[in-house]
């Protein structure tokens, strides 16, 4: 019989096994081709070129995506080869050489790859338009997205999947040449671990795994404390090592120990539900520990990165407001022309004028006593003051007397990393003038432009009018003296006002610093700053969400494939149980528990990993934690639930067919 006939007969016979592997290939090609096609879409490129890191971001995401695809396909191929191990053993028994078997399977793989690449590229071509529309929606760009076929994306994908095919063929050849004939017949049915009595050492190691995870979580909450900031990199390595190592020990020892304890408490009186749930988990935990650890860590990392990116995107409005606390900001009396144009166009607005006066102070003096050894405590900088009467225009209830001050405009990551305390005295100076402020309250309300506060988030002192008048004797030492905040009464006027703001050059400010040098600054409008934030963060949130989806689909599919493989291995056991009288619903109760563990435990631990990772440094990315975190987590829970339902459905099919 010729090789071609053998290939056709083999593929026809193994059709029920191939669809799983074939789906993995098609899914991988679709993901990769749609993403590289997206990079070469002219409408998309025109929208993202405003971001200086667009090219680097797309390239980095492409490499990560290729790693995901490589990992996914190699794992699927490994499961596929394991399920065909008996067939490969039979080929050797009838006299076929290992070289001939390798050629036979190589031809099958090549045919599968060619078919998967063609179908995957077609699916990727059509799905790329959907992804392009999503990206433009995230960027708030209006553009007509056309179906664009990129020859560059085609060539890149063909090269990548040719390399992947070569790697798969090497993996397959290695497995055939390095596995004994006897092991081929037992590979699909051998128990992973014989359950023995647990030793005290195993119990200690299992408990140690839990302690390591808890310590990693605790250390993550202290990661950005001032006391540990100097050893940030070392602390991050320790946290990674303890959480990943602890996760492995939990899966390798803790889970099996807990299951064995439950079994022993029943004193041998195990129900069919216990047999089908507890026993398989215990037997397979040795080999599953590595894969479950990897899946858990990948879930935590992908969810954490996706959540942090979403926090940054979600907080783009708050971030813009911290730098531009009003629809428009006019500095140093240089926006009169803009106000005239607003009145000419009958655009109604509210106006608040703030007088500004700089002082020199070391705000670190407001830190807690345990932090006063930190070098930041003695660093002096320019901080601006505003009179109470101006502040009361936006906060009418504010009250001060004597040397009392309110510290406001202080929030975001600055307030999280360097928390300040009220009821402290602070010595400030302005030229030869020196005053002692008593801070009675700290507000996070933004009132002054980020240009004045050196980037936004910097503090502002609200002082009594008498104190402010005294400080203005040193006005010549500081560049900023006046700010006008404009808030439009109708959002419908924003687009027109934006054009007038640009036409009047109201955002171009010239100021003279304390050294007599003239500098030019560009003050954005709130809407302009918000759109800049979205343009710079939109691509990041899209690529991280895309990669997060790829990671999630990969880990979920691997769990699903693994459960399908285990279901086939346990088919004979279900046949015996059905023949001795157990109903389908009795068997399915144990399977429900088993699937709840296989999908639920990695998901729960992964969610905990991502929660503590995000909680440790979310304030560096935005101002809102709860909503983005819950939205991202719910998406992950929903998709994992779908995979669990599919897995249960497959088990139900196997149980029904077992008789």
Model-derived regions: residue spans:
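Short helix-loop junctions at transmembrane helix boundaries
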Residues: 37-47, 51, 116, 121-153, ...
């Amino acid at each position: 019989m010729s090789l071609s006939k053998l290939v056709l007969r083999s593929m026809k016979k193994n059709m029920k096994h191939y669809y799983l592997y074939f789906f993995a290939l098609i899914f991988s090609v679709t993901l990769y081709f749609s993403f590289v096609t997206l990079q070469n879409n002219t409408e998309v490129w025109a929208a993202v070129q405003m971001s200086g890191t667009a090219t680097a971001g797309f390239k980095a995401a492409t490499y990560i995506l290729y790693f995901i695809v490589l990992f996914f396909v190699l794992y699927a191929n490994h499961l596929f080869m394991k399920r065909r191990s008996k067939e490969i053993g039979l080929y050797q028994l009838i006299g076929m050489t290992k070289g001939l078997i390798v050629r036979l399977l190589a031809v099958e793989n090549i045919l599968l790859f060619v078919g998967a690449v063609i179908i995957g590229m077609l699916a990727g071509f059509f799905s790329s338009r959907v992804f392009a529309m999503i990206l433009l929606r995230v960027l708030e760009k209006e553009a007509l997205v056309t179906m664009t076929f990129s020859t560059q994306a085609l060539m890149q994908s063909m090269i990548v999947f040719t390399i992947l095919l070569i790697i798969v063929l090497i993996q397959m050849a290695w497995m055939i040449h390095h596995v004994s004939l006897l092991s081929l017949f037992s590979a699909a049915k051998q128990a992973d671990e014989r359950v023995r009595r647990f030793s005290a050492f195993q119990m200690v190691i299992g408990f140690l795994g839990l302690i390591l995870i808890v310590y990693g979580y605790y250390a993550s909450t202290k990661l950005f404390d001032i006391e540990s900031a100097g050893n940030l990199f070392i602390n991050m390595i320790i946290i990674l090592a303890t959480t990943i190592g602890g996760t492995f020990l939990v899966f390798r020892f803790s889970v099996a120990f807990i299951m064995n304890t439950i079994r022993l408490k029943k004193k041998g009186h195990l129900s069919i539900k216990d047999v089908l749930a507890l026993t398989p988990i215990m037997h397979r935990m040795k080999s599953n520990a590595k894969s479950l650890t990897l899946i858990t860590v990948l879930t935590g990392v992908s969810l954490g990165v996706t959540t942090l990116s979403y926090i940054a995107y979600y907080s783009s409005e708050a971030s813009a407001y911290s730098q531009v606390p009003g629809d428009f900001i006019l500095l140093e009396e240089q926006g009169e022309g803009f106000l005239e144009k607003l009145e000419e166009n009958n655009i109604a607005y509210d106006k608040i004028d703030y007088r500004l006066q700089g002082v020199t102070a070391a705000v670190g003096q407001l830190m807690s006593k345990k932090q006063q050894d930190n070098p930041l405590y003695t660093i002096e900088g320019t901080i601006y003051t505003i009179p109470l009467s101006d502040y009361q225009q936006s906060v009418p209830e504010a009250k001060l007397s004597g040397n009392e001050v309110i510290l406001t405009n202080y929030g975001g990551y600055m307030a999280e990393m360097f928390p300040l305390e009220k009821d402290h005295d602070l010595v400030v100076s302005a030229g030869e003038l020196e005053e002692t402020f008593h801070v009675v309250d700290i507000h996070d309300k933004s009132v002054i432009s980020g240009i004045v506060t050196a980037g936004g988030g910097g503090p502002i002192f609200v002082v009594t009018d008498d104190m402010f008048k005294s400080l203005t004797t040193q006005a010549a030492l500081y560049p900023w003296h006046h700010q006008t905040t404009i808030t439009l009464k109708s959002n419908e006027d924003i687009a027109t006002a934006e054009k007038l703001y640009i036409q009047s050059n109201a955002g171009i400010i010239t100021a003279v610093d304390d050294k007599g040098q003239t500098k030019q600054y560009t003050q954005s409008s709130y809407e302009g700053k918000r759109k800049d934030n979205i343009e710079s963060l939109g691509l990041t949130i899209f690529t991280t969400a895309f990669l997060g989806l790829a990671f999630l689909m990969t880990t979920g599919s691997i769990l699903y494939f693994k459960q399908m493989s285990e279901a086939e291995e346990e088919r004979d056991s279900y046949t015996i149980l059905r023949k001795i009288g157990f109903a389908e619903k009795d068997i399915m109760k144990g399977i429900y528990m088993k699937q709840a563990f296989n999908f639920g435990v990695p998901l729960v631990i992964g969610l905990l990993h991502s929660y503590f990772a995000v909680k440790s440094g979310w304030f560096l990315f935005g101002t809102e934690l709860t909503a983005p975190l819950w939205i991202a987590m719910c998406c992950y829970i929903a998709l994992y639930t779908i995979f669990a339902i599919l897995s249960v459905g497959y088990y139900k099919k196997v149980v029904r067919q077992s008789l």
